[in-house]
Amino acid sequence: MVSSFSSKRLGDTMDSLALGSNWAGGVAIVLFLAPLALHLVSSYLFPSTSTVINSGRAWDIFRTTAKKRFRSDAARLLQNGFEKSPDAFRILTDNGPLLVLSPRYAREVRSDDRLSLDHFIASEFHPDIPGFEPFKLILDPRNPLNTILKTSLTQALEDLSVEVADALSTALTDDSEWHEISPCQTALKLVAQMASKAFIGPEKCRDPKWHNVIITYTHNVYRAAQALHFWPKFLRPIVARFLPACQTLQAQIAEAREILEPLVAQRRADRACRAAQGKPVPSRADVIDWLEDSHGDQPYDPVAAQLLLSFAAIHGTSNLLAQALMDLCTAPDLIRDIRAEITSVLGDAGLTRAALYRLKLMDSALKESQRLAPNRLLSMGRIAQSDMHLSDGLRIPRGTTLMVSAHAMWEPQIYPDPRRYDGYRFYKLRQVPGQEGQHQLVSATEKHMGFGYGKHACPGRFFAAAEIKVALCHILLKYDLEHRGGGPPPRVWSQGIHLFPDPTARIRVRRRKEEISL
């Protein structure tokens, strides 16, 4: 199944690596350090014990060709790797060598404290380089964001419906004639507005400038991080000074501070005033106040925290919503059945957390979309903090970067006819006695690692699932959907191990009279 995903280049890599007007100084530095680079890179990238699937040619000291091939054809490389070595192999990624493990190792990796997720994320996103400051929070033991994602955010669900209705009125309009829309752009707008309501409250949640910052910062983080990956680690802080993508990140953080810091200051002043008057200080149901409560008098950077939350919450959620919309367009009978489920469940209970849980067919359709197009081909990224051996004797040296393949989601022994979208698949599995709770969208298992697996499974998956379900309730009740005629359904795009819905895809929608009012 991995090889069935289409692989398309998303822009000219060399443009991303341009060093701007100061290129001459950067080149001089690189030439000066080249002899040292020769020694360090060759010894670091290719230790004698490594067998690398795409090692490249010996003369390519920075392995640029191998890295480019990984970014453009990772699915095929991974398939070749498992054909040669079904349990584990090494592959050269754009960020160095990676040990790829079979899904059978997922249970061992999921809870081993010698394997660090935090250090893996830090290695991907350069927290010590200007522009990437939000990622410093990942290594801060006081960071409360995981707790907020797991627990507090679910308190904000009641407000999401209002934001979806507002966003849809402009994104899809009230036009009762068929018209085309971009599912990717529509999903981004909806998720950005819903997340903003939960993260920063009502004052700025509809601010288009804030939406633009949190959407484009995530895109630019990936662009800048991947551009830096083409350089040896010891050169990246130097290269970043001249890299336009890194300069863009710094400008966006400054813009985020201009928007958010006055709001945070006003909140703090209001809280201090109430406390001085002896009045109770209420905590609003948004991340600004939850961060204030959790930090107390300890200093922290609220803007960095908001950008990190947005990075984690927006694009993955919007990608799943967009993919689900495109998949549903291939299954009009499924749309009809989900619409009937929404009408029945919400007609009785209204739009509540309990009602969202009862939308089991919708949940199944979403989980199936995620099965076919997860955010990554590989999951459970870790860095070994000490030398270790797995149960079968596989040795993992200290400092090894590893990930577990997600290809169990496309195994016919686990999911019959795995290439086919079947929105009823997980609904039927939940009818099996004893498996009612094992096949929910938020269930993270070794057979479905769409949200990861183990103690580091995505902490925001409950909030993400709720956002998407609220959005789909509005969309399916209020609009008819169909694919634009004249061709097959859009295919999933890939870059490296990352998967995402076709950003050029269009679907047709028209306003309909909803059976119940939300």
Swiss-Prot record:
So where does this one cross the membrane?
26-46
Keywords linked to the UniProt accession = Heme, Iron, Membrane, Metal-binding, Monooxygenase, Oxidoreductase, Transmembrane, Transmembrane helix
One GO molecular function term?
Answer: heme binding
What's the Enzyme Commission number for this chain?
1.-.-.-
User: Practical use of this protein?
Assistant: Pyripyropene A and its derivatives have very unique characteristics of selectively inhibiting the acyl-coenzyme A:cholesterol acyltransferase 2 (ACAT2) isozyme. Therefore, pyripyropenes are expected to be developed as a new type of anti-atherosclerotic agent. Furthermore, pyripyropenes have been shown to exhibit anti-angiogenic activity against human umbilical vein endothelial cells. Finally, pyripyropene A also exhibits insecticidal properties.
Where does it live in the cell?
Membrane
Cystine links in this protein are: none
**The family this protein is said to belong to:** Belongs to the cytochrome P450 family.
Specify the protein name: Cytochrome P450 monooxygenase pyr3
The organism of origin for this protein? Aspergillus fumigatus (strain ATCC MYA-4609 / CBS 101355 / FGSC A1100 / Af293) (Neosartorya fumigata)
